[in-house]
A protein has these predicted regions:
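Active-site beta-loop-alpha junctions enriched in small/polar residues
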Residues: 1, 22-24, 46-50, 75-77, ...
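N-terminal pre-domain/capping segments
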Residues: 1-63, 67-68, 241, 245-263
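Generic structural signal for well-ordered alpha-helices
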Residues: 7-9, 29-33, 55-60, 85-92, ...
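Hydrophobic faces of well-ordered beta-strands that scaffold small-molecule active sites
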Residues: 19-21, 41-47, 70-72, 102-104, ...
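Active-site acidic/histidine proton-transfer and metal-coordination neighborhood
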Residues: 42-130, 139
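Acidic/histidine-rich catalytic cores of soluble enzymes
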Residues: 97-182
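Short, electropositive alpha-helical surface patch
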Residues: 122, 181-200, 222-241
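A short, acidic, amphipathic alpha-helical segment used as a generic capping/interface helix at domain edges
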Residues: 150-153, 187-211
Length: 263
């Protein structure tokens, strides 16, 4: 197990620009942020708000940590769309009043668990900024292969609204699959296409001086699949570097192919 200091050093030396840290563990996050400043790394934060009344604490910590934005995995579970719109609207208003950009992540076991419900939330909240972790919907909807046109159209709506992205590759039954296994290459290619589509939407919409955050998010077990011996079947650290390089290649290709007036 690497120490916090070792982790920050490795991340900086590998060429990453920043780290996403938790608003749930203030002391650990403050310690990490101190090391990140010394290493020249920027910061985003994530939180799991389970009430509107307690959300200001998450916002205050993210501001203290100088987070570029606070990403929300909202642990409030309304049944109706109108209730969901009300809850998220109140959270977004707290962010606005505090001057902190907020994103709402597409994630299972939270308010955006269901793809179709999330699309309705987006319609009711035109100013809701999406952080797109599309792997969750691949599993949640159990997309068949090849992905049907109907499901592709739904996914494109998510990508068109995304202001940030999170990178792991899923299959219809597994949330995080190994990147170099031959049997996974169809899903790898599909996620690369989705990320490129999302970044193309973003570039067409956002001002030229806006920063796009792409988080290489590869979770430990049980996200990571393990063998009988309990050890993971791939090296998540090396896979995170692989995803970083893929995303930068996509960005450079989009940059090269864009017209000067577009950016």
């Amino acid at each position: 197990e690497w120490s916090l200091d070792e982790q920050v050093t490795m991340i900086a030396q590998a060429g990453f620009d920043g780290i996403d840290i938790s608003a749930q563990h203030p002391d650990e996050s403050r310690a990490a942020r101190h090391l990140m400043r010394d290493a020249g790394l920027s910061c985003t934060c994530y939180a799991f708000p389970d009430s509107v009344s307690g959300f200001q604490r998450d916002v205050d910590l993210a501001l203290e940590l100088e987070a570029q934005h606070l990403n929300l995995i909202i642990q409030i579970f309304p049944v109706s769309v109108s209730e969901g719109v009300d809850v998220i609207g109140r959270l977004l208003e707290i962010g606005r009043q505090s001057g902190l950009p907020l994103t709402v992540e597409t994630h299972r076991n939270c308010i955006t668990t269901d793809l179709l419900y999330t699309l309705q939330l987006m319609e009711g909240l035109p100013d809701m900024a999406i952080s797109a972790d599309i792997s969750h919907y691949v599993v949640e909807r159990e997309f068949t292969w090849p992905v049907p046109e109907r499901d592709e159209a739904w996914m494109q709506q998510i990508l068109a609204r995304a202001v940030a992205f999170q990178g792991r590759v899923a299959s219809r039954e597994q949330i995080q699959i190994q990147l170099d296994f031959p049997q996974h290459q169809g899903w790898v290619s599909k996620h690369l296409q989705w990320w490129e589509d999302g970044m193309r939407h973003w570039r067409a919409r956002e001002p030229a001086d806006t920063k796009l955050n792409f988080l290489t998010q590869l979770g430990p077990p049980p996200y990571a699949i393990t063998g009988r011996d309990g050890y993971e079947l791939s090296d998540r650290w090396q896979e995170s570097i692989t995803i970083m390089n893929w995303v930068r290649e996509i960005w450079q290709r989009l940059e090269k192919n864009s017209k000067p007036e577009q950016r």
